[in-house]
Amino acid sequence: MDACIAPATDKLIVDVVFPFTLSTPKYGPSRPFTGNHAAKAAYVDALEAELASLDDEVCMRPVSAVRLSGGASIMSADKVCHLVRRIKKTLNLVPGAEISIDVEPLTVCTPSLTDWTSCGITRVNLAALSCDDAELTALGAHHSREQLQNALLFLEKFHMANVNFEVLYGVPGQTAASWKRTLLTLAGIDALHVSIRPLVDAASDKAWTAAQTGKANTAQEGVPAAPLPSPETRRALYEQAQRILGERGYTEIAPGDFAKSGLAPASGVFGPLMRAGADVLGLGAGARSRLDGFLYENACDYDLYVAKSADFEAIVRNPLREDEQSLHARVCPPIENLTAAQRFEFLETIGATLAR
C-alpha cells in the first residue's frame, strides 16, 4: 500500500444513506430494503445514534454540504426532518451549507415539501429517469410522465427552484428520438441542472449486494431485465445529449452534469466537492466514508446497523488507507482537461454512483 496522500480539497461533506426502495428495481444500483413504517422509523433512530456517537474532532470540522441519499424521500418526512435538525445541532455546518435530498417524483406533495422546506433542505435531486412513459415502464419506475409533471407543479408551488433532474441513457428500447424528447422536455422547462447517467444492470451490483445482505439482487417480480445497449449506442446517446443541451444554453460542468450557462449555483455543492476529492462522512447502512486518508464502509445488514449503529467497531467494514491510485480513480479532473473519450469513460465507469 502506498503512503496516504492528501485529499484534493480540505472540505468535508456528509452523505446520509437511506437504503430503502418502494420495490425491487429491474436495474441497479440496488437498495436491499423495502421495510414497513416501523422498520423505517427504527432506521432513522439508528442514524441519530450513529450521529451522536461521532468524535468531537469530526463534529468540529466545517461541513459544506449534506446529502440525504437513496430512498430518503420515501421515509417519514417528519422523521427525516428531525434528523436534519439533529445534524445541524451536532455537526459544524458552514453558513449557507447545502442540504440536498434524493427524491422520487411520487413523494413530492404538499406534506413532504412542507416538512422539507421547514427543516432547511435547500436542493432536490429529482429521479426523473425519463420523460417517456414507455421507457419508464421498461425501467420499472414508480411514476409516469404525468406524475412527474405533477411533481414539478408542487416544486414550483413551494418555490423550490434548486432542482437537479436526473435522467438515464442506455435504457432498453430507448431511441435517439425518445432521448431527444426527454432532453428537450427538460430544456423546455428551463431546468437549471440536468444530470445524465448510464443505466446500470442490476446484475453488476449482484455480488456486492449478496455479500452484504446474503441475498442476491433480482429483477423486479422475477422478470428478467432486458439487456442494455452496446457501448457504441450509449456513447452516441451521450454525445447527442451534449449537442442538444449545448445548443440550448447548457454547459457541461462535469461528465454528465449540465448547468444553465451563467448560473453557477445550479451545479450544486455536494457533487462538485465529491468529484474534487473532498472528505466524505457516510452515515447509515452501507455508507462509505473517506476521512483523513482512510476509507471505510458501514455494514449493509439492517439488523446489525439498527442494533449497533453507535458502535464504530461493530458496524465498520474494511478500513484501509487510501493510496494515490484509488484517489485518482474517484477524483474527476477539470472537464476542460478531458477528451471526449475520457469524459464518456469516466461517466460509464463510475457515473451511476456520482452525486449530483
Regions found by a protein language model. Name each.
Residues 1-23, 28, 74:
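Flexible, acidic/Gly-rich N-terminal and inter-domain linker regions that tether
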Residues 4-11, 33-57, 61-348:
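C-terminal scaffold of the Radical SAM
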Residues 348-351, 356:
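C-terminal functional modules
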